[in-house]
C-alpha cells in the first residue's frame, strides 16, 4: 500500500482519491522534509484544481489554509501555515495523519493518536490560541530563569562590592538587595560551620580507614528546572568538568538512566540537552527535592523526594 517506509509525505494508493500520510515526531515535525507533498500526488491533481495554497480540514469542522512552495526537488507546505495547524491541534507526539484530497486542493485530515485511537474532536486542552499560549508560557519561564540566574550569580559572587549585582540585574530593588545580603551572610556562616564539620568527618574517616564521602548536592525544583538544571557553583568548581561533557544520570529506584549534556557557561553551568526529557519522565514537579551524587567523573545518581 505504501511505496516505502519513510515517516513523511508518502503516496497512498488503492483508493479513489489521492492521499498521503505523515507520522509527526517532536524532533522533526516542522522540517522541510516533513512538510513535503509527494510528487506523485501533485501530478495526480489536474492543473485546473492545483494552486499555491491548500486547505487542511479536520473531522470536527475546523480548517487551516497553508501556502505551498517548491524547491528544485519537491513541493512543500510553508512552515507558517503548517506550524499553525500542528500547534492548534497539539501535535508532535508520534500521531499518524492521513491527508485525502477531495477537490480544489482541499484535504480531509484524519488524525490517529500514538495508541491508534482516532481523534474525532479537539483535545480538551487545545484552543485556537494554544500555539500562542505555549509560546507565552515558554517566554514566561525564560524570564523567570533569567531572573533566577541574575540573583544566583550575584549571591554566589565573593566580591564585597554590590555594584556587580546592580550591573548584572539592573532591576533588583533595594529591599531585594538587603535580603540577598542577609542571605549571603547567613550562607557564609553556615558554610564555615559546614566546612568545619566536613573536615572533622573526613578526618574521622581517614582514621577509621574508610573512603572519602561521595560528592553530592541537593536542589529544590523550581519552574526553570523543568527546562534545564543549573548546578551550584561551589559543586561545579570542586567536582565538575571545565568543558561541555555528556553525563549519564541514573535513577536506581526505577532502574532508568538518561544521557544529559552538561554545558559550561560563564553565568551558570547546567544540565541542558536531554534534561527536560529526564524531568518529564521522572514526573518532577516544582517543590520536589532532588539529591545528586557524583558516582563517577561523568555519571550521577539522582534521588527524588516529594515534599
UniProtKB/Swiss-Prot annotation:
Top-level taxon of origin: Eukaryota
DNA-binding region(s) from the entry: 20-115, 214-307
InterPro entries: B3_DNA-bd (IPR003340), DNA-bd_pseudobarrel_sf (IPR015300), REM16-like (IPR044837)
Span list, region Disordered: 122-141, 151-209
Keyword Repeat attached: yes
Compartments reported by the entry: Nucleus
First-listed, main subcellular location of the protein, grouped into a coarse class: nucleus
Gene Ontology molecular-function annotations: DNA binding; protein heterodimerization activity
PROSITE patterns: B3
Residue ranges, compositional bias (Polar residues): 166-177
Database matches in Pfam families: B3
Keyword Transcription regulation: yes
Cellular component terms (Gene Ontology): nucleus
Species this chain originates from: Arabidopsis thaliana (Mouse-ear cress)
Official protein name in the record: B3 domain-containing protein At5g18000
The entry's keywords: DNA-binding, Nucleus, Repeat, Transcription, Transcription regulation
GO BP, one annotated term: double fertilization forming a zygote and endosperm
Gene3D superfamilies recorded: DNA-binding pseudobarrel domain
Amino acid at each position: 500500500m505504501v511505496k516505502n517506509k519513510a515517516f513523511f509525505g508518502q503516496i497512498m494508493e488503492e483508493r479513489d482519491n489521492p492521499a498521503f500520510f505523515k507520522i509527526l515526531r517532536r524532533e522533526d515535525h516542522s522540517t522541510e522534509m516533513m512538510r513535503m507533498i509527494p510528487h506523485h500526488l501533485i501530478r495526480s491533481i489536474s492543473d485546473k484544481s492545483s494552486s499555491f495554497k491548500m486547505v487542511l480540514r479536520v473531522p470536527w469542522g475546523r480548517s487551516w489554509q497553508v501556502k505551498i512552495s517548491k524547491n528544485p526537488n519537491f513541493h512543500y507546505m510553508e512552515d507558517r501555515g503548517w506550524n499553525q495547524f500542528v500547534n492548534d491541534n497539539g501535535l508532535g507526539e508520534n500521531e499518524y495523519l492521513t491527508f485525502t484530497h477531495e477537490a480544489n486542493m482541499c484535504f480531509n485530515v484524519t488524525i490517529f493518536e500514538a495508541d491508534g485511537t482516532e481523534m474525532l474532536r479537539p483535545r480538551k486542552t487545545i484552543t485556537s490560541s494554544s500555539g500562542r499560549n505555549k509560546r507565552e508560557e515558554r517566554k514566561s519561564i525564560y524570564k523567570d530563569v533569567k531572573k533566577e540566574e541574575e540573583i544566583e550569580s550575584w549571591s554566589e559572587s565573593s566580591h564585597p562590592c554590590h555594584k556587580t549585582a546592580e550591573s548584572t540585574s539592573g532591576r533588583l530593588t533595594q529591599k531585594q538587595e538587603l535580603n540577598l545580603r542577609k542571605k549571603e551572610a547567613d550562607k557564609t556562616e553556615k558554610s564555615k560551620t559546614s566546612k568545619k564539620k566536613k573536615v572533622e568527618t573526613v578526618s574521622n574517616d581517614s582514621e577509621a580507614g574508610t573512603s572519602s564521602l561521595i560528592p553530592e548536592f541537593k536542589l529544590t525544583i523550581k519552574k526553570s528546572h523543568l527546562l534545564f538544571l543549573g548546578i551550584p557553583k561551589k559543586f561545579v568548581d570542586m567536582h565538575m568538568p571545565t568543558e561541555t561533557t555528556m553525563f549519564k544520570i541514573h535513577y536506581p529506584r526505577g532502574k532508568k538512566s538518561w544521557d544529559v549534556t552538561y554545558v559550561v557557561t560563564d553565568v551558570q553551568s547546567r544540565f541542558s540537552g536531554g534534561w527536560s526529557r529526564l524531568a518529564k519522565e521522572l514526573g518532577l514537579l516544582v517543590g520536589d527535592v532532588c539529591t545528586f551524587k557524583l558516582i563517577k567523573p561523568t555519571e550521577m545518581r539522582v534521588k527524588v523526594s516529594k515534599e
